[in-house]
Amino acid sequence: MAPKKKKVAGLIKLQIQAGAANPAPPVGPALGQHGVNIMEFCKAYNAATESQRGNIVPVEITVYEDRSFSFITKTPPAAQLIKKAAGVAKGSGVPHTTKVGKITMDQVREIAETKKEDLNANDIDAAAKIIAGTARSMGIEVN
């Protein structure tokens, strides 16, 4: 007989600095209200994202009724990767009038390669278009 499936009690989505999860907000309160062992999650997340230090890594945590959990890490947000490539601290407040930086199409393709698994695109060209659109809406020129 197949083992019974665990019942899902909740789904938590967070964006945490890679390798730097700790019980302080926002991690602690989000997990605490679902009864998850916070330190256990922090240790597992930090171990899983150690290689990506310096990036913000989104994570989807599935909490089960027996208070156990599983999590899936995603690729860093496109906006974060674009800001790093353009060398700017933040996007423009008025993106269509004030440009804050420039990135090349090669950089856009590189970011698209990184993000491809999380994007809703069939090929790398479609993924590059999505990334270029995000860059433009941040006030960053794409050449």
Swiss-Prot record:
After translation, the protein is modified as follows: One or more lysine residues are methylated.
Q: Which UniProt keywords are listed?
A: Methylation, Ribonucleoprotein, Ribosomal protein, RNA-binding, rRNA-binding
**Listed Pfam families:** Ribosomal_L11, Ribosomal_L11_N
Is rRNA-binding among this UniProt entry's keywords? yes
Annotated GO molecular function terms are: large ribosomal subunit rRNA binding; structural constituent of ribosome
CDD domains reported in the protein's UniProt record: Ribosomal_L11
Q: InterPro entries, per this entry?
A: Ribosomal_uL11, Ribosomal_uL11_bac-typ, Ribosomal_uL11_C, Ribosomal_uL11_C_sf, Ribosomal_uL11_CS, Ribosomal_uL11_N, Ribosomal_uL11_N_sf
Origin superkingdom: Bacteria
UniProt GO BP: translation
Annotated Gene Ontology cellular components are: cytosolic large ribosomal subunit
Self-association and partners: Part of the ribosomal stalk of the 50S ribosomal subunit. Interacts with L10 and the large rRNA to form the base of the stalk. L10 forms an elongated spine to which L12 dimers bind in a sequential fashion forming a multimeric L10(L12)X complex.
Q: What does this protein do?
A: Forms part of the ribosomal stalk which helps the ribosome interact with GTP-bound translation factors.
Q: Which family does the record assign?
A: Belongs to the universal ribosomal protein uL11 family.
Q: What is this protein called?
A: Large ribosomal subunit protein uL11
Q: Which gene encodes it?
A: rplK
